[in-house]
Structures are given as structure tokens and as C-alpha cells.
Design a protein with these regions (language model features):
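Short turn/helix-capping motifs enriched in Asx and small/polar residues
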Residues: 1-25
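Boundary/linker segments flanking structured domains
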Residues: 26-32, 36, 44-150
Length: 150
């Protein structure tokens, strides 16, 4: 996907096109040559967020996404758990997500001792690699025309 920026700001002629009025969230994964390079969530239409990444010069050539997740936590569980698995191995040094310091605002999402399925902890639900992979089996891939737009 190329990088062409004509306008660094924008006006939303239809605000509902940028934000889901039902409050649903989406989760997406970006790929380069078949390798996962980015995980993200959004409360807007996922395809528009993916196109923003293309405009921001993120280096990817494919994407898969799930829309209509019931809330922020459901989307964040997938993103946070996935990133924890990614960053726990040296083979994923090329991930485009920013690694974050262990600070209060993010600690509960990435540290295995703070997940809700860890007895007596209050935090997010930690998903296994298999659980994430199983959910992504039904994810929507980018169409050829969407790939050309980016």
C-alpha cells in the first residue's frame, strides 16, 4: 500500500460514517507478505481505520477484520492478548505496534498476572493464541478493490 497524503486534517461530512452509532467495536490485523505486523481496535468502521493506516505509511499489504464486537473490552481483550503473545517472543520484533512501558494505564492489558481468568485478579480476559486464531477464521479479508484504494 502506498503513502500519499494530500490533507493532514479532515471534516466528517457524515459523522456516523466515522463512528458506529450502536457503540460496537472492531478488531483488525494488518499483514505484510503473509506475516502479522499490526493489531488494532476501533469504534469506527474498520475499513476506514485500515485506510488511515495506509495513509500514515504503515507497511502492510493485506488485512483481516471483525466488526460488531459488543464493547471496548471485547475488542481490547483480543488486541491486548494478541500483543502479549507477540511481544513474548523474539520472532515478532517487526510488529508495528508501539511497545509500551509497564504503566498503570496499560499494565492490566498486557501483564499475564492481571487478567480476569487469573484467580483473584481484576482485569481483562486473557485469550490464548488459539482463541484469537479461532475468532479470526471468520474475519473479513480486504477485497482487491480495497487493497487498491490503499
Amino acid at each position: 500500500m502506498g503513502c500519499w497524503v494530500e490533507n493532514l486534517w479532515g471534516f466528517a461530512p457524515n459523522a456516523l460514517a466515522w463512528v458506529d452509532p450502536l457503540g460496537l467495536y472492531g478488531y483488525y490485523e494488518l499483514y505484510k507478505n503473509g506475516k502479522l505486523v499490526y493489531r488494532g481496535i476501533t469504534e469506527r468502521k474498520v475499513i476506514e481505520r485500515i485506510m488511515e493506516h495506509a495513509g500514515d505509511c504503515k507497511d502492510f499489504d493485506d488485512a483481516r477484520y471483525i466488526e460488531g464486537l459488543k464493547n471496548y473490552r471485547a475488542a481490547r481483550d483480543m488486541e491486548g492478548s494478541g500483543l502479549w503473545h507477540d511481544w513474548d517472543t523474539d520472532k515478532n520484533k517487526d510488529m508495528l505496534n508501539k511497545k509500551r512501558k509497564i504503566v498503570k494505564g496499560y499494565y492490566h492489558s498486557y501483564h499475564k498476572d492481571k487478567f480476569t481468568n487469573n484467580k483473584d485478579k481484576d482485569g481483562r480476559t486473557f485469550l490464548t493464541k488459539k482463541q484469537i486464531s479461532d475468532r479470526m477464521k471468520n474475519a473479513t479479508p480486504l477485497t482487491q478493490s480495497e487493497k487498491k484504494q490503499g
